[in-house]
Amino acid sequence: MQKVLVVMDMQKDVVDGALGSAQAQLIVDNVRQKIENFDGPIIFTRDTHDTDYLESQEGKFLPVTHCVKNTEGWHIVPGLIEAAEGRPIMSPVSFIDKPNFGSFELLSRLEGMNSVNPIESITLVGLCTDICVVSNAIILKAGLPEIPVYVDSSCCAGVTEESHQAALTTMKMCQCIVE
């Protein structure tokens, strides 16, 4: 049995760039510590857009160019990948580039991992609680209903504190375990 950690969108543009916030910056150390102490595979997701982002439906609702592939703001904030790769255990570290909030690729990857070595639990951390974290938590609960999905609230931040709390409540109602 294995436990899996999913680190959602801890990218420069989402932490302290175009979409950054003080709340996002405050969780970076917590996320780093969670990674350093995690005994199992870690998957980093990256919000990934093209230069025509503003023409997309998401871009029309959120007209702030961010996380354009291979730009400085698209990269994971310093220290997190290094923390994952520097762990004393030899568990894999992988990446998923996702073009929108929820990722069916993440679900598919976890289903594949589960078929090879059963997953005991999945833990989600990262940004933004009220957009990508909640979207993926619900997808994972729907696709892997018998695997506990944990959300470490000390390692998440929302667009606002109110929307962060609302997302945590929503995930609890959908049988995610919010810590």
Name each model feature, range by range:
Residues I122-D130, P148-E161:
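A short glycine-rich beta-strand->turn/loop micro-motif centered on a GG-aromatic cluster
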Residues M1-F95, V116, Y150, V159, ...:
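Active-site acidic carboxylates
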Residues L54-S56, L106-R109, S135-N136, E162-S163:
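Short, well-ordered secondary-structure micro-motifs
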